[in-house]
Amino acid sequence: MSEKPAFVSVQQSLRKSFDAIEPLHEEWNNTLLECNPHLTSLSNLAEQLQACQRVLFKKTPLSSFINLQEHLRFKLQAAMEFNLEILNQKLSTLQRIRDSVSQVVGSVLYMYETSIEKIGLEAILERSSLCPSIADMLEWLQDIEKHYRNQYLQRKLLLQVCGGHLSDIQALPQSWAKQRDAASSKQQHVEDILLSVSFFRMST
C-alpha cells in the first residue's frame, strides 16, 4: 500500500466518513421504525373520520345528542393532525440525516479531488484483503448518499400526497411499506458496505 501523505490523508478521511455514517444509518433505521405506530394510527383515524362523514346521525338513536357528529369529526381531525405533526417531525430527522451524510461525502470528495494528482491512479485503485481501494470506497459513499437522498424524497412525497385525501391516508401504511420493500436492496447495499469497510475502519 502507498504511504504517500496525500494517500494516507484521504484514507483517514474515508475512515472518518464511515465512522460518521454508521450511527447516522442506525438513527435512520430507528426513525423509520418510530414512524410505524403513527402511520397506523393515522390510517385508523382516517377510516373513522370517513365513516363519521358518511353516517346520517339524524336517522340514528344518536340524533338526540346535539352536534355529536361535528364534535366527533373535530376530535378525529385533531388526532390526525397530531399524528401527522409527529410524522413531519420524523421527516425532519430524516432530512437532517440525509444532509449530514451529504456533508460527510462532500468533504471526502473535496479532499480526494485536491489530492488526486499527488496520489496517482495506481494508488487509487490499489486494494488488499483488509483495505478496499480508494476508488471503491468513494463509489460506495456516493451510493450511500444517493440512497438516503432518494429515500427521503420518497417519504416526503408520500406524506404530501396523502394531505387531503382520506383514502390515501388510509393506505399510507401500505404505501410506506411498499416503499420500504422497494428500497430493501439499496438498504442491504448500505449494510454490506459498512461490513466491507469494518476492518479498514479498525486499522490505523
From Swiss-Prot:
<dbReference type="GO" id="GO:0005634">
    <property type="term" value="C:nucleus"/>
</dbReference>
<dbReference type="GO" id="GO:0042273">
    <property type="term" value="P:ribosomal large subunit biogenesis"/>
</dbReference>
<dbReference type="Pfam" id="PF15011">
    <property type="entry name" value="CA109-like"/>
</dbReference>
<comment type="function">
    <text>Part of the 55LCC heterohexameric ATPase complex which is chromatin-associated and promotes replisome proteostasis to maintain replication fork progression and genome stability. Required for replication fork progression, sister chromatid cohesion, and chromosome stability. The ATPase activity is specifically enhanced by replication fork DNA and is coupled to cysteine protease-dependent cleavage of replisome substrates in response to replication fork damage.</text>
</comment>
<dbReference type="InterPro" id="IPR029159">
    <property type="entry name" value="CA109-like"/>
</dbReference>
<keyword id="KW-0690">Ribosome biogenesis</keyword>
<protein>
    <recommendedName>
        <fullName>AFG2-interacting ribosome maturation factor</fullName>
    </recommendedName>
</protein>
<comment type="subunit">
    <text>Part of the 55LCC heterohexameric ATPase complex. Does not associate with pre-60S ribosomal particles.</text>
</comment>
<keyword id="KW-0963">Cytoplasm</keyword>
<keyword id="KW-0539">Nucleus</keyword>
<dbReference type="GO" id="GO:0005737">
    <property type="term" value="C:cytoplasm"/>
</dbReference>
